[in-house]
Amino acid sequence: MKAPHNIFHTAGFGKVAPWIDLANSEEWDGFGNLTDHLANPRWLASFLKHWNLHPLPSKDVPSRKLVQLRVLLRRAAEKVAAGGSLGQREISNLNQALNVPVRQKLVQNQNGFRAETVPVRSDWTWVIARIAASLGEMLANHAVERIKVCANSDCRWVFRDPTKARTKRWCNDRTCGNRARVRRARAAQKQKA
């Protein structure tokens, strides 16, 4: 029996942080075709499960709030990737998303004790806060210069640049990088002709 197709992992999600996956949930395939993964309940369930965001009833999905957060995260990524910084509006909106009641819980495991922040209520506001917090954590850990947006204008995938020199331009050199090189070569040939 063939294993079920996991649209979350095969599409390249789940590698860095939940905020990046949500920002990329509106996916351009590199040829100008758009897929809105937030509209797919299977993708959303895989996203929540992968990032250990408590499974919630799918009938209660706050689609509008998730789309607003996606727009905010993408705008933040584009500003930071262009060398700018977040404006007061973005910071205020992120802080608003982060404003959920939490409590500390002491947890013991084989390595000893640790304090854990847990929600007062496990609901969608907590999920939204955790997604927004993942961007805050990346910014606070001085990983700002690693946040990039694919240079392919038909893709615009948000990614974390893992290279030492932080010079990566494309989300995937084999796809978007090759397309860019082919376009440049064709444009050069056209100019010569």
Regions found by a protein language model. Give the residues of each.
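Short helix-coil boundary/hinge micro-motifs
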Residues: 1-149, 156
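BZIP DNA-binding basic region
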Residues: 126, 130-193
